[in-house]
Amino acid sequence: MSDPQTSMAATAAVSPSDYLQPAASTTQDSQPSPLALLAATCSKIGPPAVEAAVTPPAPPQPTPRKLVPIKPAPLPLSPSKNSFGILSSKGNILQIQGSQLSTSYPGGQLVFAIQNPTVVNKGTRSNTSIQYQAVPQIQASSPQTIQVQPSLTNQIQIIPGTNQAIITPSPSSHKPVPIKPAPVQKSSTTTTPAQSGANVVKLTGGGGNVTLTLPVNNLVNTSDPGAATQLLTESPPAPLSKTNKKARKKSLPAAQPPVAVAEQVETVLIETTADNIIQAGNNLLIVQSPGGGQPAVVQQVQVVPPKAEQQQVVQIPQQALRVVQAASATLPTVPQKPSQNFQIQAAEPSPTQVYIRTPSGEVQTVLVQDSPPATAATASTTTCSSPASRAAHLSGTSKKHSAAILRKERPLPKIAPAGSIISLNAAQLAAAAQAMQTININGVQVQGVPVTITNTGGQQQLTVQNVSGNNLTISGLSPTQIQLQMEQALAGETQPGEKRRRMACTCPNCKDGDKRSGEQGKKKHVCHIPDCGKTFRKTSLLRAHVRLHTGERPFVCNWFFCGKRFTRSDELQRHARTHTGDKRFECAQCQKRFMRSDHLTKHYKTHLVTKNL
């Protein structure tokens, strides 16, 4: 071990491993193997006696072969004599201290501990960012506090902290504007405890706008409260001075990777004036002052940063919100028009002849004539009253001009358009004849337009027209139709209380039926509608059948909100039982009642079937 060259040339019997090199490998003289250099370096450790004492007896070793001498690479001068250097395959030199070597491992192998080199993380900032180290300054005037709410993807909204507002703008915000920090003064090297954890950014006053935008990913929060906060802004690469390089070297080792905290808030002091406008992202906040040296007032609004796949929630505190004091325009009050009352002075109306036709077929002619009212009416209306009060309001009724057709079924004196009852008030019609302004029918007021009242069948029942003269025209049917109906009514006029006799059929289409010798045959009543030819035994049946062809349904149900029409009277009577619930047909065996006789007959058959079983 006295000569290093001879010791490395000798056979190193450390262990039967890959550290040995055969003598035939002459091509590696120019480039020594790293394993060979490691074996040569390890051969310098301690005297052989120590290794023999520690190393346990090994199995018989194979015959060693001669190694080619390898020239070690030159090692740099080390301040310690116990340090060793290892040349890697890439040409790097690793220094190993003597205290890191251990020869007590069994098997004669060498174990040494190599500490991992310190890796400097350079990925905490972007390539195009410039690092500014802003030193806190002493500010004489009272500044406004602004809170910055960092977010993962969005930018930061900065709002003067009179009410401590935090707003996070939408992700689609414009590119941040670089911030130029205030120049560092010599007096700012000594920081005060009151401003050790905050930066001061001064915005120039005046009437111009001030735009301040901070990217979220450029905020670094240090754990040391006394350390200066680092502000990173995106800007084009610029040459760095020596002072900035020194400041970076000092700040990088002390900087720690930022912790992902959702509610982390950094306070920045911004000195603003009354005319400043602060804008961040797509949001705009205008700070105005009413003047006179009064401080600006800002509304307090807090915006919760949105989470993943959630909508942004805006929360307004329950405290009293102070609104920005500014000149506000008072909206003029809308003048309301006073209610107008129409004063109507009715003159002596002329007699009016009214034709009223009920659904049962009755046609009445009424002569209406009223005396002028004592006082003027405040509003002219046409209202609906009950049919019982119709006779009280109508005057001048003459029996000579009235005709009624009495039938077996009960009369239906009511007019039921859409199920409602309509009657005429003669006094109000007389007032409406002079100046008709409003017509009130079933709660619906119509001004200045003619009103036509129809029933559910579509037939015209009553027409009220606004005429220019002093007369009010009320008519339900055309004059020709009224004349025809009056003739039919007068032809069948009978006295009240008399029974209607059955009249013989005089229809030319009707012919005698088959009769035997010596017997009077029955006449057949044939339907004269083309392509029909049906025959009936009774004229009533023929008339009811003809109504099916013509679509005439003279029998109307007078029940409230019903108004159904039928071609035969028995159909109307049968339908009326559905409203009254009358069940006049009773079963003799089980006392079950039915509305219709055919239903009772069908039910009686069930008893016959059970009896036969």
UniProtKB/Swiss-Prot annotation:
<keyword id="KW-0010">Activator</keyword>
<dbReference type="GO" id="GO:0005634">
    <property type="term" value="C:nucleus"/>
</dbReference>
<protein>
    <recommendedName>
        <fullName>Transcription factor Sp2</fullName>
    </recommendedName>
</protein>
<keyword id="KW-0804">Transcription</keyword>
<keyword id="KW-0677">Repeat</keyword>
<keyword id="KW-0238">DNA-binding</keyword>
<dbReference type="Pfam" id="PF00096">
    <property type="entry name" value="zf-C2H2"/>
</dbReference>
<keyword id="KW-0863">Zinc-finger</keyword>
<feature type="compositionally biased region" description="Polar residues">
    <location>
        <begin position="23"/>
        <end position="32"/>
    </location>
</feature>
<feature type="short sequence motif" description="9aaTAD; inactive">
    <location>
        <begin position="361"/>
        <end position="369"/>
    </location>
</feature>
<keyword id="KW-0479">Metal-binding</keyword>
<feature type="zinc finger region" description="C2H2-type 1">
    <location>
        <begin position="525"/>
        <end position="549"/>
    </location>
</feature>
<keyword id="KW-0805">Transcription regulation</keyword>
<keyword id="KW-0862">Zinc</keyword>
<dbReference type="GO" id="GO:0008270">
    <property type="term" value="F:zinc ion binding"/>
</dbReference>
<feature type="compositionally biased region" description="Low complexity">
    <location>
        <begin position="374"/>
        <end position="392"/>
    </location>
</feature>
<feature type="zinc finger region" description="C2H2-type 2">
    <location>
        <begin position="555"/>
        <end position="579"/>
    </location>
</feature>
<feature type="modified residue" description="Phosphoserine">
    <location>
        <position position="78"/>
    </location>
</feature>
<keyword id="KW-0539">Nucleus</keyword>
<feature type="zinc finger region" description="C2H2-type 3">
    <location>
        <begin position="585"/>
        <end position="607"/>
    </location>
</feature>
<feature type="compositionally biased region" description="Polar residues">
    <location>
        <begin position="185"/>
        <end position="197"/>
    </location>
</feature>
<dbReference type="InterPro" id="IPR036236">
    <property type="entry name" value="Znf_C2H2_sf"/>
</dbReference>
<comment type="similarity">
    <text>Belongs to the Sp1 C2H2-type zinc-finger protein family.</text>
</comment>
<keyword id="KW-0597">Phosphoprotein</keyword>
<dbReference type="GO" id="GO:0006357">
    <property type="term" value="P:regulation of transcription by RNA polymerase II"/>
</dbReference>
<feature type="region of interest" description="Disordered">
    <location>
        <begin position="1"/>
        <end position="32"/>
    </location>
</feature>
<comment type="function">
    <text>Binds to GC box promoters elements and selectively activates mRNA synthesis from genes that contain functional recognition sites.</text>
</comment>
<feature type="region of interest" description="Disordered">
    <location>
        <begin position="374"/>
        <end position="402"/>
    </location>
</feature>
<dbReference type="InterPro" id="IPR013087">
    <property type="entry name" value="Znf_C2H2_type"/>
</dbReference>
<dbReference type="GO" id="GO:0000978">
    <property type="term" value="F:RNA polymerase II cis-regulatory region sequence-specific DNA binding"/>
</dbReference>
<dbReference type="GO" id="GO:0000981">
    <property type="term" value="F:DNA-binding transcription factor activity, RNA polymerase II-specific"/>
</dbReference>
<feature type="region of interest" description="Disordered">
    <location>
        <begin position="170"/>
        <end position="197"/>
    </location>
</feature>
<feature type="region of interest" description="Disordered">
    <location>
        <begin position="225"/>
        <end position="255"/>
    </location>
</feature>
